[in-house]
């Protein structure tokens, strides 16, 4: 799910799907129910702005398999913008949306799935997690017996938990004999590089990112290829054009094959088409291949339109992908039309009023954008309310309506300041910073 790390928390409304019967009121309540009923708890960390969540809601979290799963678990749909759920995201080190995280009746994490999946893959992975075989404690016990497959499993689990430092620290506790032979195992070697990539990203170490990402990309990483290549593209931005091309050019052939065989096919193996397309566009742009950049974006646009058959509401994931492709392609006229259609398609949602209003304000059209932001503000709350207010303030200040801007900040501070103090502080500072 490209560029969907939780640091970018924008929007939220009514959940796209729900479990059967009455749902627990909170994660704490879900855990208590799971313990009481001796059932695992499955938490879906999502948000209404999350395009990958749209995909899962429409294509995966429904039907017989979903009904069967709900009878086996206590399900809770966590809202990334609600203070209580956000606190749990921090506690559990959840950085990616959606994340599906299972916790056993005893409180031990059973495993987690990051990002969207094709239907069959999701239910297969969930089944494995609920069996208990993916518990970190079990994996470590198996690794202690000398299983290199278990060593790789442990490292992969730390990677899914965004715990690069902890994973490498655990690896260093293994007997020297195991560590010395581990690099001969392709899975272990790849898992180690993925943890080193996490550490380099945490440290904002571009050289470390380039080194680790290049090694990871040399492995069989399936649907994660766009995300890792995106890391590499980003880490080379500061390099001279020739040096950057030398680092990125070797990735083009493998990535073109990935697009042709796993994304642009009738039955894609990888569900996240958006990340695949945007990473391709960024790669081609970095290589100076303007024609390739334009072509892959237009292919994404045309395929989205073809599958939607003129009905945006038939698939929100596809509709939102179309919007983002048009943004990236700078197709302003098409985008203006589409965003208004999206607002009409989801009238109870502040998402598209916000996106359209923000884009107008950023484009210097404060007077045109403000009404859309005001419409969004009526439906926004939590972290989203602060984000919408930020652009309301920007628009009002551009229109020399500073008194109204102060009223927006005051109202937002009163409603959300206690739950989101850092974000509200930045909002307050926006009253005096250069607009």
Where in the sequence are the language-model features?
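Non-catalytic, surface beta->alpha helical segment in thiol-disulfide oxidoreductase systems
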Residues: 61, 94-135
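Start-of-helix register in tetratricopeptide repeats
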Residues: 275, 317, 351, 385-387
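Structural register within alpha-helical repeat arrays
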Residues: 151-158, 174, 192-199, 228-235, ...
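Structural motif corresponding to the intra-repeat A-B loop/turn of tetratricopeptide repeats
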Residues: 161-165, 199-203, 239, 287, ...
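Flexible helix-coil transition and linker loops at the boundaries of alpha-helical arrays
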Residues: 140-143, 174-190, 215-226, 243-245, ...
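Thiol-based oxidoreductase modules, predominantly thioredoxin-like and allied folds used
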Residues: 20-25, 45-47, 60-85, 94
